[in-house]
Every structure is written in structure tokens, then in C-alpha cells.
């Protein structure tokens, strides 16, 4: 394995530099992920133009890759082995607080960079913190014991697995928050990635009528919405 890792580092608003970091020595309960896919989220675009803090950051929080090196304790706890392809959630909770015990680790203070300057969250944590590799826009990603990983099923490509985050948002917003279910009538305003993900979620949930709205410039996305299961699409500019 190489001695250094190349990463794209946000160093200022709208500015990226390629930097080398030392390949970290992982503890027995840690691992290194060789990054295959790192998605670009709408949040990334916003944070790139207006960073919330000045520290250098390796962005990228929608990450899929292969376990390149793993400590024994890590593999035993996670049920993973070197060579396994995994999707990594961007929240790194403490697993001790009330939120973590409820399974809502995204609300854990240990991963909330807005209130905790020492928080760990992929794509948001300063590259100055130990192990440095806290974002997917790099060759490798560091996985501590409390990283949330999901094995990618055999036959699913890294590119396809990279859609897990937006699709998960669609499932949560449509099914959990809005309560969409069998025979529901649904209006989705906007055929962006999140809106299209909700089309998939609503269709699978058994919605009887799915309507998606957009503008003339969304013509291709509205067409895709139909392919994904929308019953009607409406161009609101016509």
C-alpha cells in the first residue's frame, strides 16, 4: 500500500487544492476504505461556496468503496473483511447518548459539527484532525470503530450503491415523514434527485397516484419521473 494519500481539500470558499496526507496506521478497531465512488450532494455545493468554518476539509459524504485494510477488532464487530464493498454513512456517533441508543445517531453531539468543533462527520470534519481522511474526495477514507457501514450486496456496482443516500432521503421524507402508503395520492414538487427518489419510494409503497411538477428546463427529469413510476408530470411554466 502507498505511503501517502492524495485528496482534494477545500481550503477556502470555492477553492480546492490537491494535497498529500500520510497513509495512517490504523488501530485494531479501525479500517481504511479505498474510495470507489463519492457523490456530490446539493449540500456540498452550498458548503463549497460558503464554508461554515475556515479549516481545510476533504469534502464528500456519500461514499462507497472497498475495505483495503482492517484491524481484527473492526472486522469482528462489523462482520466485514478486507475486500468487502461497503457504503459508509456520514454520521459518526458516540453510541453512548440517548440519540444513539434510539438509533438516531445523526442527532448525536459527537457528529454535529454545528455545535461541536471536534465532531466527526464525513465531508465536514477538519482534515487537521487525527487520521486526516474524513471525506470521500480522497483515495482513502479512515473508518473508526463507530463508523456506520453497510455491506453492498454482490452484483451491485459501486456507482449504483452511491445512490443510497438520496434514495434513503426519499424513503424517509415520503414514507416516514409524510406517511405515504397503499392507495396514497402524492404530489412531488420538483424532479431533482431527492424528488425522483421519492417517486421510487412512493411507487414501492403502493401509492395509487403520483404527480410530479417541474419547469420547462426540467423536461428530461420529468421524463425520467414517468419512467420511475410517476402517473402524471406537470410543467408549471406552461
Task: Give the positions of each predicted feature.
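Nucleotide donor/acceptor-binding cores
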Residues: 5, 84, 183-184, 208
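Short Gly/Pro-enriched turn/cap motifs at secondary-structure boundaries
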Residues: 11, 22-23, 54-60, 128-133, ...
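Residue-level recognition of beta-strand termini and adjacent short loop/turns
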Residues: 12-14, 27
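Glycine-rich beta-strand-centered segment in the early N-terminal region that forms part
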Residues: 24-38, 51-101, 105-106, 153-155
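NAD(P)H dinucleotide-binding glycine-rich loop of Rossmann-like/cofactor-binding domains
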Residues: 96-189
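Hydrophobic/small residue at the entry helix of a nucleotide-binding pocket
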Residues: 169, 194, 217
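Adenosine-nucleotide cofactor-binding segment
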Residues: 188-191, 203-238
Amino acid at each position: 500500500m502507498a505511503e501517502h494519500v492524495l485528496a482534494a481539500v477545500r481550503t477556502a470558499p470555492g477553492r480546492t487544492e490537491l494535497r498529500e496526507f500520510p497513509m495512517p496506521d490504523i488501530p485494531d478497531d479501525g479500517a481504511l476504505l479505498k474510495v470507489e465512488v463519492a457523490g456530490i450532494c446539493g449540500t456540498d455545493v452550498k458548503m463549497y461556496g460558503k464554508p461554515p468554518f475556515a479549516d481545510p476539509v476533504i469534502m464528500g459524504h456519500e461514499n462507497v468503496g472497498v475495505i483495503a485494510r482492517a484491524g481484527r477488532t473492526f472486522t469482528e464487530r462489523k462482520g466485514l473483511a478486507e475486500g468487502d464493498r461497503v457504503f459508509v454513512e456520514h454520521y459518526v456517533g458516540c453510541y453512548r447518548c440517548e440519540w444513539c441508543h434510539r438509533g438516531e445517531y445523526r442527532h448525536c453531539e459527537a457528529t454535529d459539527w454545528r455545535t461541536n468543533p471536534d465532531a466527526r462527520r464525513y465531508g465536514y470534519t477538519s482534515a487537521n484532525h487525527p487520521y486526516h481522511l474524513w471525506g470521500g474526495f480522497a483515495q482513502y477514507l479512515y473508518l473508526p470503530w463507530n463508523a456506520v457501514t453497510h455491506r453492498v450486496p454482490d452484483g451491485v456496482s459501486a456507482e449504483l450503491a452511491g445512490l443510497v443516500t438520496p434514495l434513503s432521503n426519499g424513503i424517509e421524507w415520503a414514507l416516514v415523514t409524510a406517511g405515504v402508503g397503499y392507495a396514497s395520492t402524492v404530489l412531488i414538487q420538483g424532479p431533482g434527485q431527492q424528488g425522483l427518489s421519492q417517486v421510487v419510494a412512493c411507487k414501492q409503497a403502493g401509492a395509487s397516484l403520483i404527480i410530479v411538477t417541474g419547469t420547462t428546463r426540467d423536461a428530461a427529469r420529468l421524463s425520467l419521473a414517468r419512467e420511475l413510476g410517476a402517473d402524471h408530470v406537470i410543467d408549471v411554466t406552461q
